[in-house]
Design a protein with these regions (language model features):
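Polyanionic/metal-chelating signatures
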Residues: 115, 120-270, 407
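His/Asp/Glu-enriched, well-ordered alpha-helical/loop segment
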Residues: 84-85, 90-94, 99-103, 244, ...
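Divalent metal-coordination and catalytic microenvironments
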Residues: 24, 39, 44, 65, ...
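C-terminal cap of metal-dependent C-N hydrolases
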Residues: 24-27, 387-431
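Boundary at the C-terminal end of the N-terminal hydrophobic targeting segment
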Residues: 14-18
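Bacterial N-terminal signal peptides
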Residues: 1-13
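Histidine-rich, glycine-flanked metal-binding segment
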Residues: 26, 30-69, 88
């Protein structure tokens, strides 16, 4: 009887109710900020956004003094795939092999991760878990930061294919100064190895295109049907330029080569990591390549807080988003994949705040973690801004979300209010209630 009752409670949806959020400063992102404004929600969708909405609602939520924002989107992260970086058993971000396009990151996400509620408590409602390892690492799907299972959490499968572009820098260290002399390579050997890796990647995509043509022609005009190969099947939408390829590249030469490769083959690409993207901002703008900049805090590499080169100013990566924006590049901010990035994803609003402090307009900074990732990931029809017709995924904070002192007080995902409790708040309450020494 208990099991039957439980199943029935899950199968029968809750009665739809109309909710009116009133009194808050509404940051629509796609339009003007309403101070104060009102948002009407019905069946999980935003029905109306205005200064005054004259209609009756089943429930009125007063948010006087609060700031209402659309849910933040982390466009490149290891959240859900990595729990404790020092514990191998909790790291499931990479697969064995150099070319694994059929890997699907969303099936590996741990819905019970303690890090997901922590990120959610600071306004992050959606995230893109990125597979890593090898050259073609696999595909990512967009997840919502709330749900019992991966099926609950996956809102869009196969968002992008991830390529970790081969290294393009040459090591000029003399052999006599090289630590492990057995691994030392001459400049000629390094250049040859680099060319071979790029050629292998180009050949891989050529084979994918050939497979796509064979699949289209199979069974027609007396031609035999092509045998289905999972890896090549996964490549079909990318070989046909239907879905974007996310190229993870930091070095200037890597980014240049990747953009030229994409332009030559008419591929849609997104550059992620993008440490040196500011150096080639014009090239990126000309080719309309969006950038996911991950180096505000993790600058040269994992957990590094200094620029990659001694000749760079201390603020080179703080000003990079503004440099890209001025050139006409669509800039998205994220915390990336390095080191403790999954645990520090909660700091996403503060990366945007740092960019504002060094020149990026505040409205652009807010778009870089809301509307722009929604557009690039193909979900702008339902996420990324507060406007009629979109999903009612938003949160109320007690101040500017780009201000370190602000706190998220309430959150709704698809019109349903979610719990903001997490491991951090539980520990806070636990130790706050500790008996004091007399």
């Amino acid at each position: 009887m208990f099991s039957l009752g439980f199943c029935l409670s899950v199968a029968v949806p809750a009665l739809a109710e109309t909710i009116l959020l009133t009194g808050a400063t509404v940051h629509t992102v796609s339009g003007p900020t309403l101070a104060p404004g009102q948002v009407l929600i019905k069946d999980g969708k935003i029905v109306a956004v205005d200064k005054v909405i004259r209609t009756k609602a089943d429930k009125v939520v007063k948010l006087d003094g609060r700031h209402l924002y659309p849910g933040l989107i982390a466009a490149s992260t290891s959240l859900g795939l990595v729990e404790i970086n020092a514990v191998r058993a909790t790291r499931d971000a990479s697969e064995v092999g150099e070319y694994t396009p059929d890997v699907e990151s969303w099936v590996a996400v741990n819905p019970d991760s303690e890090l997901i509620p922590v990120a959610r408590a600071n306004g992050i409602t959606h995230f893109l878990p990125v597979p890593s390892g090898g050259i073609v690492a696999g595909q990512s799907g967009l997840m919502v930061a709330d749900g019992w299972t991966i099926e609950d959490m996956t809102i869009k499968k196969a968002v992008a294919l991830h390529i970790f572009w081969p290294g393009m820098e040459l090591d000029t260290t003399p052999k006599e100064e090289f630590k492990d002399k057995s691994k030392w390579k001459s400049l000629e050997d390094q250049a040859k190895e680099r060319r071979e890796k790029i050629k292998a990647l180009e050949d891989f995509f050529e084979e994918a295109r050939a497979y796509a043509k064979a699949r289209e022609a199979g069974g027609k005009n007396g031609l035999p049907s092509e045998n289905v190969v999972p890896a090549w099947e996964a490549m079909l939408p990318y070989a046909r330029s239907e879905l974007p390829v996310m190229v993870h590249a930091d070095n200037e030469r890597q980014i240049k080569t990747a953009v030229q490769w994409a332009a030559t083959n008419s591929f849609k690409i997104i550059v992620a990591g993008a440490r040196d993207a500011w150096k080639v901002a014009g090239l990126l703008a000309t080719n309309q390549v969006p950038v996911i900049f991950e180096r505000i805090y993790n600058q040269a590499s994992a957990l590094s807080s200094t620029p990659a080169r001694d000749t760079h100013r201390y603020d080179v990566y703080f000003t990079a988003p503004e440099t890209l924006h001025q050139a006409g590049v669509k800039v998205i901010l994220s915390e990336g994949l390095d080191g403790q990035a999954a645990a520090t994803l909660r700091n996403l609003p503060y990366s945007a705040a740092q960019a504002v402090a060094f020149g990026l307009p505040e409205d652009e900074a807010l778009k870089s973690i809301t509307l722009y990732p929604a557009q690039v990931l193909g979900v702008a029809d339902r996420l990324g801004s507060i406007e009629a017709g979109k999903e009612a995924t938003l949160f109320a904070a007690d101040g500017d979300i780009l201000d370190l002192r602000s706190h998220v007080k309430r959150m709704w995902i698809a019109g349903r209010e979610v719990n903001l409790e997490n491991r951090h708040t539980r520990l806070y309450e636990k130790y706050r209630a500790r008996p004091r020494a007399k």
